[in-house]
Structure formats: structure tokens, C-alpha cells
Amino acid sequence: MYEIKESDWKIFRKKIIGWQENYMQKLNKEYIEILQRDENPAKNFWDLENRIFHDKKSVGVVIDMRRSMMFNNILSLLNEETIQLDDLNDFSEEFQNDIKDVVNMLG
């Protein structure tokens, strides 16, 4: 299991709120676009309902805030494009490098 430094854990707890708010703001704009389509109103409604059903499970919306999950949560946030590697600049160099190594391995 990956050992998270206290300093990285503190940074993560501070940043996650803003990351999630930004992600949900992006989602809200996309939801508005769905509702404003020139489609059947029922289709727009059900498309939006389906989209929200899937989005509400993403780490960018709801997160398991355990220190032991932080590394995996960061990887999920990157995968979902909630954050970019540049968003990790405040974290320790070791943590950034470990994340980059896994991202490169996963392709």
C-alpha cells in the first residue's frame, strides 16, 4: 500500500473541495446544454436523468475521503479529467512522480 505523507494529505483535503466544485460547475453547464437541445422534451429529460445517474458516482462529485484512498482518488480525478497533472504542483515531488509513473504505465 502507498504511504501518503501528512503534508500531501493536508494539501489534498484543502484542494478537493475546489476541484469538485469546478467539476460540478462544468457538469451543470453540460446539463443545461442537454436541456436546451432542440429535441423532444421527454428525450432531453431522460438523457439528463441518465447522465446525472452516471455522473453522481464519479470521484469528481462524491469521494471516499480516507487517506488510504487518496492515491487512487487522484488517479480517478485525472482519469475523469476533473484535474490535470499541473494541479498536483503543490504536492511533494515524490508524490507527483509516483502519480506520473502510474499514469504513464496505464497509458
Segments (PLM) and residue ranges:
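Acidic, Ser/Pro/Thr-rich low-complexity regulatory regions
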Residues: 1-107
